[in-house]
Structures are given as structure tokens and as C-alpha cells.
């Protein structure tokens, strides 16, 4: 993940590092620490992970998971930890967080829907259906 990002941002890192944020610079630098063989090994493992998980989509159009450890923070300074979406991003699967529930102080509590690789149209249809279904049941 960080190696991909590091590769994508190399030009900006080399030419305009002073214009990048501290966290982005740190992530780019972490990504630069991996060799090409380590990167290839990780990509192979990622593909194996997807193949072992893809059987789920033979029977289901999507998987519902938590989107976070709790309700959203007030304001927009922090959007939350990516820990609940990282595994799906890692496997190349589409995911979306839907604010279907509410928690403390009436703040949204996201539900994450995960779809199959290269099946985005169906995935978006399922997300739309799920959101409407939950609102209809309120």
C-alpha cells in the first residue's frame, strides 16, 4: 500500500517535498524502504489472499462489516482509522461506508459494504438497495 503510494508520489517527493504534508512524507518514506522483490512477494500474497476470499462472492453479492470502532468524530479534522478498510483495499475489493446507524450524540455509525473485484456496477446496486432498505425500515 505505502510502496504503491511511494511510487505514485516519487515525482512530488523529489521535486516538491516541502509542499507535502508530514504524514504523507512519512508514508512515502516507509514505502521507499521495501525492495522490488519484497514488493513482488507482497503482491503475490495479496493475490493469494483474494483467491481464498473470492469464494464468498459465489454465494453473496456483498459482505457487511464494521466501518470503524465506533461513531464518527465530531467535525472533519479526523475521518477515523483506516483499519477496517485496509484489508479490502489490499485485496483490490471495492468497499463503501454507509451511515446506516447512529450512536452516541446522534453521530453516524458506519456500516461497510464490500463487493467483488471488477463487479462495481453490481456492488453499487447492492449498496443503493441496502441504503434504501435500511431507511425504509426506520
Segment roles from a protein language model:
Residues 34, 39-44, 90-138:
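Structural helix-boundary/capping segments
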Residues 1-50, 54, 99-110:
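Short helix-loop capping/hinge segments that flank enzyme active sites or metal/cofactor-binding pockets
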Residues 52-54, 79-99:
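Small-aliphatic-rich amphipathic alpha-helix that forms the alpha element of a beta-alpha
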Residues 41, 68-87:
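Short, surface-exposed loop/helix-turn segments at secondary-structure junctions
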Residues 2, 6, 81-84, 127:
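Amphipathic alpha-helical segments in well-structured domains
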